[in-house]
Amino acid sequence: MHIGVAATPDVAIPTLDWLISSEHKVDLVITQPDKPAGRGRALKQSVVGEWATARDIPVLKPVTSDELIGKINDLDCVVTIGYGVLLPQHILDLPKFGFINLHFSLLPAYRGAAPAQRALQNGEVTTGVSVFQLEKGMDTGPIYAQRTVS
């Protein structure tokens, strides 16, 4: 399969490493635009952007979701991991199999950002991960797999 990955934080790196070692081809990485960092406030790309650049994988840093049109249409799917942007349905429908998300909670619990942190703050002793089809809502769509972690 030809896949894209939409991710920003370093928590995505182990999954990216696994994907490039699999039989699938990572054709494109989508990440957040560069942001000011450090004392000099110089623009710095995300950890995921650095990871992709080091492996000669094309990186796209769209400011608007419509910048993805024409860039992801030929992909079989896009895997998202902490990308941080709610995408409209017309974008989610572009790849052949849509967007598949890896989310760090047992959905429907803890939809949205920082689910593992919120579970810990609430004293949960069991949480997990979910793999599901992205739809236009916040972490909605059919769940394909879940794994519990205690």
Region spans (language model):
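One-carbon transfer enzymes
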Residues: M1-S150
